[in-house]
Structures are given as structure tokens and as C-alpha cells.
Amino acid sequence: MLPHRPRAYAQLAYHIFNIADAFLEHEVRSLRLDEGAYDRVPPPEMNTKAKIIAYGQDVLRRFRLWWDGPGHAPNLSRKALVYYGNVTVHEFLERTTWHCGQHVRQLVMVLDIMGIEPDRPPSEETFAGLPMPDKVWDDEGS
């Protein structure tokens, strides 16, 4: 289990990919982001590292298709259909980006605790301009 969270490592990896997938559901399938969307867990058949990695690669592939197509020049000022308030698609995309980034920071910290050197870890510049939380975990000491 993860420190500070009742979540397994695989669930964290899935969650990172699913955050971006929820954005794509909004943009590609016109689905509203409902409360609980970020609480999804991997389906039972997604029970190996390889399957979670394949899901992440599929999300990345679909995001690139969106970005290079309709996402290349979308109307980012239009209202996003999300549970957490009156925001634009630009704000939703920004939140999606830093939300994924925050969990990547958590995963990197877990790897560090386990003595595993991550491949291409994010740097401060990776998140420049984003409203990233100061702490990696909400309940971290100062």
C-alpha cells in the first residue's frame, strides 16, 4: 500500500492514466466529469503490470490523436461539464495536467523509498507554471 493513502501501487498508476482518460471522455465523447470519476479502480481483468502499462499507452495514444486533431485548436474558453464548478475547458485541462503530475510526484517518491531510480523523473521545470501543491502528500509534515 502507498504511504499516506489506502491505495495500492497499481491503483496509483491506473489513477494517473485514468485522470487523463476522464479528460478525453469529456472532449472526445462529450461525457460530463461526474463526482467519483477520479475514484475509479482498475477493472478485474486489468490485473498485471503489463495490462496497466498497455492502458496508459492507449490513453497516451488517444490523447495524442486528440491533441493533433480537435485538441490542436479547440475553443478552450468554452464551459467544461465537470462536477466541481464553473470552469473552462482550459482550466479543466490545466487541472488534469497538474493532477496527473501530482500523482507522478507521489509515484517517484515511492520509487525513491524503494530504492528504485526512475527513468526520466520530472523536474521542477516539468511543472513550471502549474499550480502544483508544495507537498507531495496532503498530510506530509512541514
Residue ranges and their predicted role:
Residues 1-42, 78-142:
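Short, contiguous alpha-helical
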Residues 63, 71-74, 98:
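C-terminal regulatory/effector modules of DNA-binding transcriptional regulators
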Residues 53, 57, 64, 94-97:
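Short amphipathic alpha-helical segments with heptad-repeat character
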Residues 1-5, 51, 71:
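Proteins with a high burden of low-complexity, intrinsically disordered sequence enriched in S/T/G/P/A and R
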Residues 44-59:
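A short, structured beta-strand-centered segment in the mid-to-C-terminal lobe
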Residues 8, 47-48, 71, 88:
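Helix N-cap and loop-to-helix transition residues
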